[in-house]
C-alpha cells in the first residue's frame, strides 16, 4: 500500500472517530449565525531561492504562483427559515481588505445526485497498515517509543481510537440544511484571492433579505495572523532535525507533526511535538483558546513563548520523503447581539452571533539540507542527460507526501 492510500485510509477512519452526537445537535434557539474562518498558510523550503520556489509552486499548482504566504477567508451565514425566491446577501468590508466594497454571499446550488456504482461482491479486504508513532521534542527517541500500530494485530476500531487522539471542542459552522438559509463566500460568482497585504481591521456589515443586519468590528489581535516562518532547520533524515521558528505575535500556542514512509519496510512513520503520547490528527485545525490552554497544561500543545523543537534522530532514516506540518493557533472573536440587560429579570434572546476564528499553518519538506550543495556542485551530468533541478527533485518528494495532512 503506497503512502497516499495509507493516508486516505487513515483519514477515513478518523472522520468516523471524530464524529459525536453533539455535532448533530440542533441549536435551541433560531439564532442567525455568521462564521468568519481566517487562515494564513506558508510553505517553506530551506535553501531555495524565491525563483526556485516560484517554479516549484507553479509545477505543484499547475499555474504560475506567487512566492510567499497565502491568506484565505471563508464566510458562512446561516439564518433560520427558508430563503426567498430571490435571495440576496453581502458582506461590506473595510478598505484595508483591498477586495472592493463588499463580498457577495451566495446560496450554493444544489448538486445533482450521482448514480452510485454497482456494489462489489464479497467482503472488502482489510487494509494492511503498520505505523510507527513517536512523540516529543528532543534529539533522541524517548522511552517506550515507538508505539506500533498494526492493523494485522488490532481491530479497525482499536486502530481508529489510537490514531484519533485528542480533539478540541465540537465546532459546527453554518451549513446547508432543511428549514435554514445558508450562504457563503467564496462562491461561484466571486472567488478572488485575498491579497497578501489584506487586513480585516475595521468595521464589517453583513446584510441581506433573509437575515438580520449584522454589524461588528475586528481589531488587530483578530486580524490575519503572521505567517509561519522557519528561521533555522538543521539535520537530514538520518539525523535529529532541529527547527526554529519566528514567534507569531497573536498565537496562543503551537503544534507540529511530521510523517514519512519507510522505503525498506513499507511502514508509515509519524511524529508529533507533544510531550504526551498524542498523534495530533485532531489538532491540526482551528481550536478555541480554552482548548489550547488546556492542551498546553497537558503538555500536548507548545506554549506561545516556545520557538524551537527537534525531531528525534534517525526515525526518518529510511524514509523516501517526509514533511513537517505546523500550526499556530489564533484567538477567537465572539460577538452576540443584542447585549444582555443588566437586570436578569428582563427577558433576553440573542438575534445573531458572530464567530471569527484564526490559524496560521506551515509546511516544511524535511531532509533537504543538501539542496544548496547540489546546486553549487561543479560536477557535470553525463552527456545528453538534462540535470534535474532542485525544484523538480523537491516536486517528486512533495508528490510522495501530498495529501497526508
For the regions a language model picked out, list residue spans one by one.
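Solvent-exposed N-terminal domain segments of exported/luminal and surface proteins
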Residues: 30-187
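Proline/serine/threonine-rich low-complexity linkers at boundaries of modular beta-sandwich domains
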Residues: 213-225
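Short, aromatic- and glycine-rich surface loops/edge beta-strands on solvent-exposed regions
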Residues: 190-214, 319-333
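Bacterial N-terminal signal peptides
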Residues: 8-18
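Boundary at the C-terminal end of the N-terminal hydrophobic targeting segment
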Residues: 22-27
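Structural beta-strand segments of beta-rich domains
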Residues: 239-243
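Short beta-strand elements bearing conserved aromatic residues within extracellular beta-rich modules
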Residues: 254-256
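Hydrophilic extracytoplasmic domains
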Residues: 249-252, 262-405
Amino acid at each position: 500500500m503506497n503512502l497516499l492510500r495509507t493516508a486516505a485510509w487513515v483519514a477515513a477512519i478518523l472522520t468516523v472517530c471524530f464524529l459525536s452526537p453533539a455535532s448533530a445537535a440542533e441549536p435551541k434557539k433560531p439564532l442567525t449565525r455568521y462564521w468568519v474562518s481566517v487562515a494564513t498558510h506558508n510553505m517553506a523550503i530551506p535553501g531555495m531561492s524565491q525563483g526556485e520556489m516560484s517554479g516549484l509552486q507553479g509545477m505543484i499548482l499547475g499555474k504560475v504562483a506567487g512566492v510567499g504566504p497565502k491568506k484565505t477567508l471563508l464566510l458562512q451565514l446561516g439564518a433560520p427559515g427558508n430563503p426567498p425566491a430571490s435571495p440576496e446577501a453581502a458582506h461590506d468590508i473595510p478598505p484595508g481588505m483591498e477586495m472592493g466594497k463588499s463580498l457577495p454571499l451566495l446560496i450554493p446550488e444544489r448538486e445533482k445526485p450521482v448514480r452510485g456504482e454497482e456494489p462489489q461482491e464479497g467482503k472488502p479486504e482489510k487494509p494492511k497498515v503498520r505505523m510507527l508513532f513517536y512523540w516529543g521534542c528532543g534529539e533522541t527517541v524517548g522511552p517506550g517509543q515507538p508505539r506500533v500500530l498494526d492493523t494485522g494485530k488490532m481491530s479497525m476500531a482499536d486502530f481508529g481510537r489510537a490514531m484519533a487522539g485528542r480533539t478540541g471542542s465540537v465546532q459546527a459552522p453554518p451549513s446547508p440544511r432543511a428549514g435554514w438559509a445558508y450562504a457563503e463566500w467564496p462562491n461561484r460568482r466571486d472567488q478572488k484571492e485575498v491579497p497578501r497585504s489584506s487586513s480585516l481591521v475595521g468595521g464589517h456589515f453583513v446584510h441581506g433579505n433573509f437575515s438580520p443586519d449584522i454589524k461588528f468590528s475586528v481589531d488587530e489581535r483578530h486580524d490575519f495572523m503572521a505567517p509561519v516562518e522557519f528561521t533555522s532547520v538543521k539535520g537530514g533524515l538520518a539525523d535529529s532535525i532541529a527547527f526554529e521558528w519566528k514567534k507569531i505575535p497573536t498565537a496562543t500556542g503551537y503544534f507540529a507533526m511530521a510523517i514519512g514512509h519507510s522505503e525498506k519496510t513499507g511502514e508509515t512513520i509519524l511524529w508529533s511535538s507533544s510531550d504526551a503520547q498524542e498523534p495530533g490528527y485532531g489538532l491540526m485545525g482551528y481550536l478555541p483558546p480554552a482548548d489550547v490552554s488546556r492542551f498546553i497544561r497537558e503538555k500536548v500543545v507548545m506554549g506561545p513563548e516556545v520557538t524551537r523543537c527537534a525531531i528525534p534522530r534517525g526515525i526518518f532514516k529510511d524514509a523516501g520523503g517526509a514533511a513537517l506540518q505546523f500550526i499556530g493557533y489564533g484567538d477567537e472573536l465572539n460577538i452576540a447581539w443584542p447585549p444582555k440587560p443588566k437586570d436578569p429579570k428582563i427577558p433576553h434572546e440573542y438575534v445573531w452571533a458572530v464567530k471569527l476564528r484564526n490559524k496560521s499553518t506551515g509546511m516544511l519538506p524535511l531532509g533537504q539540507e543538501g539542496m544548496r550543495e547540489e546546486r553549487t556542485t561543479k560536477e557535470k551530468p553525463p552527456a545528453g542527460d538534462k540535470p534535474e533541478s532542485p525544484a523538480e527533485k523537491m516536486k517528486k518528494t512533495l508528490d510522495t507526501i501530498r495529501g497526508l495532512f
